UniProtKB/Swiss-Prot annotation:
InterPro entries: Aminoacid_DH-like_N_sf, NAD(P)-bd_dom_sf, SDH_C, Shikimate_DH, Shikimate_DH-bd_N, Shikimate_DH_fam, Shikm_DH/Glu-tRNA_Rdtase. GO terms for cellular component: cytosol. This is Shikimate dehydrogenase (NADP(+)). GO terms for biological process: amino acid biosynthetic process; aromatic amino acid family biosynthetic process; chorismate biosynthetic process; shikimate metabolic process. Its EC number is 1.1.1.25. Shikimate binds at S15, L16, S17, T62, N87, D102, Y220. It comes from Geobacillus kaustophilus (strain HTA426). Keywords: Amino-acid biosynthesis, Aromatic amino acid biosynthesis, NADP, Oxidoreductase.
Amino acid sequence: MEKVYGLIGFPVEHSLSPLMHNDAFARLGIPARYHLFSVEPGQVGAAIAGVRALGIAGVNVTIPHKLAVIPFLDEVDEHARRIGAVNTIINNDGRLVGYNTDGLGYVQALEEEMNITLDGKRILVIGAGGGARGIYFSLLSTAAERIDMANRTVEKAERLVREGDERRSAYFSLAEAETRLAEYDIIINTTSVGMHPRVEVQPLSLERLRPGVIVSDIIYNPLETKWLKEAKARGARVQNGVGMLVYQGALAFEKWTGQWPDVNRMKQLVIEALRR
């Protein structure tokens, strides 16, 4: 019998997840389909009960439900609990277990796409929202030397560092981070600044950027933000958000099926869809 997977969120119609997952199911000969489930904010509990009742094998969870699903699950793994958000649920015979593959997917994409190890690296993360949380806690599980946080409201960055690792992390205002740019090997934008349709704005001035540094942006629409274009012009190696999108999906796929999908194929499909 064909297994059912899907995405729970609101809205979901623009998601590229069905494209990635259904192609991977077909290529690996797995009898399964991935669907979109639009779930309004008041209906999260009912939707999760539906996953149980209908025997849906697994779901991804997107905005605005990553926090709201947690009370309805039987178990939440430690990494997801620490982040305070779930993006992947597995249905083990009616027992629902929540995971978070966002930050882990980001870190794996960064290492594989840039062909680096994070050991000993000094990293600056811009932003302190949901995306930043997942990435920050995932970076803490690597051997990076420093993971510093910069945010418009410094208090949010401070809270994150206090929850994380105050020995390896400091927190700054954006203005202070701009003066310290030369200290870092990797600079990551986790905010939506520069995303379509407001493509003219940039999260941080790159005036003091050293050539050869990696500049990474989790935005994938546009594929190359104005900020990444400038970083490239200043001699940086750049990475867009397609890798994170694909690898968080691939990690969820692996949790559901026990098989690792063709991530290069997934990337190609996503880029083609974004260019349409």
